[in-house]
Design a protein with these regions (language model features):
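N-terminal leader/targeting and assembly helices and adjacent pre-domain segments
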Residues: 1-167, 172, 240-252
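Acidic, glycine-rich two-metal-ion catalytic cores of nucleic acid-processing enzymes
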Residues: 143-250
Length: 252
């Protein structure tokens, strides 16, 4: 029914865990570049390895967030955990979702890091030590990790909420979701009009949004089943349950 318990604490732990990996990869990148730094010393194999490491770490983090959100919603809406078969089905779905999200995020992050490094080849070769470090932190650094953690926590929270639909329906209820924004000045003009809206209205609201990026956000929201609508999105889904309609058999 509510946002993931201690959502901001979960996000902070996510960012710290990811930053530990990123710091090690940045150190390895610095060593690979050599002295003076030369981007040709960093091979495609190196970038692929860093992407795979990031994918594996993200999969574990995201799976934990998805399952925590799922369990919270099931307890709030049903009052107890589902039977073994339903729980196993939800777990399989969570594993698949976490792996897909992690692969997309890791691929995007490392591709961007590589582009930054390659574009700064001249700066790396001729710049000061401070210049080199600035490029490396821009490519693999805590600021980008913080954005990843915020966005991916929201995405995983949505996945866990959506996964709760199966046990809720198995218990004889329909699960109704509504978009919820944070009630503060940081809410973006894309998400503000979505507050309180059910899924059938999300696409229409975003397609007609006055803020730029509405169509792109609509496609993302449909694919996710909810937030995030953009990087750093902090929105979530509020869930309620209602009795399933019963079909009355008319004697023939």
């Amino acid at each position: 029914m509510s946002e993931l318990s201690d959502r901001m604490g979960v996000e902070r732990d996510f960012a710290r865990r990811l930053s530990r990996l990123t710091a090690r990869q940045r150190r390895e990148l610095r060593e690979k570049l050599g002295t003076p730094p030369d981007v040709t010393r960093v091979t495609a194999v190196d970038w692929a390895r860093w992407e795979d490491e990031r994918r594996q770490e993200l999969t574990l983090i995201l799976l934990a967030v998805i399952l925590a959100t799922y369990r919270q919603h099931v307890v709030e809406l049903v009052g107890e955990q589902p039977d073994d078969a339903t729980a196993a089905a939800a777990y399989r779905e969570a594993v698949v979702k976490a792996a897909a999200m992690a692969a997309e995020s890791a691929g995007s992050s490392i591709s961007t890091a590589r582009d930054i490094v390659m574009a700064a080849a001249d700066v790396l070769r001729t710049g000061t030590a401070a210049d080199v470090e600035s490029v490396l932190v821009s490519a693999l650094g805590p600021e980008r990790d913080a954005v990843t953690a915020a966005t991916a926590t929201t995405q995983a929270q949505t996945a866990g909420t959506v996964a709760a639909r199966l046990p809720v329906e198995a218990a004889g209820f329909n699960m109704v979701t509504r978009w919820v924004t944070e009630q503060d000045s940081k809410v973006c003009p894309l998400c503000r009009p979505l507050n309180g809206k059910v899924p059938d209205l999300w696409g229409l609201v975003l397609e007609n949004a006055l803020a730029p990026g509405g169509s792109r956000a609509a496609a993302s929201v449909v694919a996710n089943g909810g937030p995030p609508a953009h990087p750093n999105c902090r929105c979530y889904l509020r869930t309620t349950r209602e009795p399933q309609a019963r079909r009355v058999r008319v004697p023939g």
